[in-house]
């Protein structure tokens, strides 16, 4: 599924309770997005009969399932590196990253 069509569908649903493919296509074209009719048809068939709130809830449930299943794998991979003495390299990288983040302010100082 393409997120651009889902975003256009969500935007169109603010105006109509059940927007159609033509509504989604009109929004995409207004934004300068090229519409692939096959992909749009697939998305519209996949979300038929569901509200935007239902789609968001289903997506959030799927994302939390992915995050939970991926977290232990990342933790297991980091443990051998720390045991092998690889902890010094991330500390140096963190210091450099913090230094780069300070430069991102670009002199605006809005919250200083």
From Swiss-Prot:
Regions crossing the membrane: none
Record-annotated disulphide pairs: none
Protein modification: Phosphorylated.
GO molecular-function term, one example from the UniProt record: structural constituent of ribosome
Stored InterPro entries: P1/P2_N_sf, Ribosomal_P1/P2, Ribosomal_P1/P2_euk, Ribosomal_P2
Keyword Ribosomal protein annotated: yes
Region (Disordered): 89-112
Keywords for the protein's UniProt record, in alphabetical order: Phosphoprotein, Ribonucleoprotein, Ribosomal protein
Domain of life: Eukaryota
One record GO biological process: cytoplasmic translational elongation
Gene Ontology annotations for the cellular component aspect, listed alphabetically: cytosolic large ribosomal subunit
Subunit structure: P1 and P2 exist as dimers at the large ribosomal subunit.
Role, per record: Plays an important role in the elongation step of protein synthesis.
Family, per entry: Belongs to the eukaryotic ribosomal protein P1/P2 family.
Protein name: Large ribosomal subunit protein P2-B
Source organism phylogeny: Eukaryota, Discoba, Euglenozoa, Kinetoplastea, Metakinetoplastina
């Amino acid at each position: 599924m393409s997120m651009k069509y889902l975003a256009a569908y969500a935007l169109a649903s603010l105006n109509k309770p059940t927007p159609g493919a033509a509504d989604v296509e009109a929004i995409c074209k207004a934004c300068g997005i090229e519409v692939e009719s096959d992909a749009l048809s697939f998305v519209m068939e996949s979300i038929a009969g569901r509200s935007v709130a239902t789609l968001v809830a289903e997506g959030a449930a799927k994302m939390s399932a992915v995050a939970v299943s991926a977290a232990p794998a990342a933790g297991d991979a980091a443990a051998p590196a720390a045991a092998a003495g690889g902890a010094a390299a991330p500390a140096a990288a963190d210091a450099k990253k913090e230094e780069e983040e300070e430069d991102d302010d670009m002199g605006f100082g809005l919250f200083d």
